[in-house]
Amino acid sequence: MSSVSNDSPPRGFVAVYAFGYVGAYVALITPVATTLALKVAELDPAGKESTLGLVSAIGALFALVSNPLAGALSDRTTSRFGRRRPFIAIGTVVGVAALAIVGFAPSIPVVVVGWALAQLAFNLVLAALQALLPDQIPLVQRARVSAVLGIAQQVSPLVGIGIATGVMATGAGMGPVFVVPGVVGAALLALLVVRLPDRRLEQAKPFVLLDLVKPTPGTGADFGFAWFGRFFVILGFAIYTTYQVYFITDRVGIPTEQVTLVQLAAVLVFSLVLTASAIVSGRLSDRLQRRKVFVYAAVVVVSLGMVLLAFTTTLALFLVAAGVIGVGIGAFFAVDLALITDVLPDQEHAAARDLGVFNIANALPQSVAPAIAPIFLAIGGGGNYTLLFLVAAVLALIGAALIAPIKAVR
């Protein structure tokens, strides 16, 4: 049976699919957005910036390997439970256990081990989730569904930070701050596991490790331009997300104990404008069957938000900048995922593998951003967030420029 859907998905599936996305990202992005930085600051307050960079980079490297490997294996899985369901289930269980290791870690080395395992496990989940788009959603609906998934992904920090803030208010310590969002995420993913109309593959060619790096037949320049375009946009955005906590405390001057409340306000603003932007962009993109013009406009708006952030010193301006970035990134995630699935060379037999390769463009910036950011922060005596976010704006614009040569989509 073909793995590419030409029929509308079952009633209610898109909602369950979106809840699964929320679950995965509540578990994984809550640490990225706030709690991992707080855990590192608790264990190493003097060297928190460089230590966070190290922990984030190692975790991102594990994500880098896990996603395409899981995708290739998922494409070949002949389990009676389907091709995608086993990876979602196993990755979720292991991921929640890994979050517990991070939360209760007594030292930075234990944090590194736990976070690497969490990234590996949840990228098993993400590889399967992304493959459901070409598996279950017809081409003419993909931008709209991508918009819903983009909203789900970006609303997840709001849910996760809200949960983390509530847990922190109880004085329970950092362990439950990691575990509780993970358990909530697992519950949402369990709903998808139960409801997923997963197709069973009757026969598959053997897995060869070389397949991870060997291009899928039909892969052309469009695939490469789409990959590098996303990489640079996400790299600019990753600088914002990775250093948001320290920007709030060091530049805006918010006390550490109030950081999660400020982040909650920022994510609320971010999520509201993102939702509106994603819905409008996704519908227009599907109606017009155009992708690139929406990506260009989205990235310009993201870059404007980064420039505003570069010169921000007050809480009010920080929230405005978060809103501007939300408008742009909402449109970007809504349309770019649809663009990516449009240029996949073999949607029937290698969708998860190729989407896993594309997800490297999501994961690798999480490693590169904390590696390069301290260089710019250190210029001029340290804490140079102005230069850092100007660089982030330029990186995003480079990503938009790389979309232009793509020929398979308009």
Would you name each region that the model predicts?
Residues 66-81, 276-290, 377:
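Helix-to-loop junctions at the C-terminal end of transmembrane segments
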